[in-house]
Amino acid sequence: MSVTAFTNAVLVCPIGGEIRDRTLLVEDGVVTGMGDAPEGATVVDCGGKLLAPGIVDLGVFKVDRAACRAGGIVRIGLMPDQSPVLDDPGVVQRAALIGRPDLWIHPIAAATRSLAGTDLAEMAVCVSAGAKAVGTGRSWIADSGVMHRVLAYAGDLGLTVISHAEDGGLAADAVATEGETASRLGLPSAPAIAEALAIARDLMLAEETGAKLHIRQVTTASGFDLIRAAKRRGVKVTCGITPAHLHLSDIAVTDFRTYARLSPPLRDESDRQAALAAVADGTVDVIGSGHDPHGPESKRLPFVDAEAGMAGAETLLPLALMLVRDERITLPRLFALLASNPARVLGLDTGTLEPGKPADLMLFDADKPWMVSGDALASAGNTPFDGFPVQGRALRLWKAGREIL
């Protein structure tokens, strides 16, 4: 039996909302409790820094071990938009293994074959192969009958359906949010209500079927209002957002900055403020990186031709910590958003420092200043935060008690 004592640590406990100066005890890769280090234990001196659950990044589009390690991410929920699509048990099983030994990968199986939005995928066999949820990928299922069957089938399996919320009839060819910025730049745009229309339909179907629904990114005031109302009615819905939609508005695409071309697109300032309020009041359950790195060949193109997406894994922690420094949320609440809540969406018994949980741990310095540089990121440097001053760095990282950073 191997016992490790993490001493001189400030423990961030998302369950219970506490910060404690205690010693954390780990035995054979599992948290056993808090207390004095037993004789013969391996001692890790944390130097007074913060020790928290490793980040569970829900909604990642590419397995990127170096970027995840640098960002304090121990587990990822891998989106089904892979090549090949995660709609086959063999493909799902291989995807679950490719992060070893440094990263837990939890595949999100495709809800429909080839993510085409027509025929249901073989969800049950994908679950047996390791899928932890099912998803619609980068797009919305337009056929309400298909989405109803997806939710009903997933509900029978106890799975969460992870949905992209943009009405394709309005947003299909859009690259920006309708408004002053898009008009000035002459960009094809869609009204922000495209999100609310998609959310409203999916919420009604989730309520009808009793299934668990996670809207991966909600970015508009009207969308948050719908989520709040549904939660009050008892609908089993959760929602997420990325730091980009919390810290940037559509002004960031001025001068046709393709690194700020995202999906869903950046919104106007009023929607950004609504997003910050939704994080503060508990409407938002998850903050994820939306990690979707692209090389210059995909981004250094005319805005309408550039790929949507950004490299986000390495900057997730410092950008999320800005919410704590701005006193919008507490540090324990932040790690509920980054670890325990996304774990719960995926049906994982992790993301906390409670006894019996896997010792997925991150030691970090919340005050360490650095400058985001696309050229220096571990993954492709397509970040809209290039040149942005931030604070917060992962110092050491453990996966089931084994150090990986």
Where are the regions that the model predicts?
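Divalent metal-coordination and catalytic microenvironments
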Residues: 9, 24, 29, 48, ...
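Histidine/acidic residue-rich metal-binding segments in metalloenzymes
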Residues: 118-287
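N-terminal metal-binding scaffold of metallo-dependent hydrolase/deaminase domains
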Residues: 1-38
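Alpha-helix-loop-beta-strand connector modules within alpha/beta enzyme cores
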Residues: 89-105, 152-163, 315, 319
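Active-site beta->alpha loop and helix N-cap motifs at the rims of alpha/beta catalytic domains
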Residues: 109-116
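His/Asp/Glu-enriched, well-ordered alpha-helical/loop segment
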Residues: 184-212, 280-281, 286-287, 292-367
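C-terminal cap of metal-dependent C-N hydrolases
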Residues: 357-405
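Metal-associated gating/positioning segment near the N- to mid-region
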Residues: 45-99
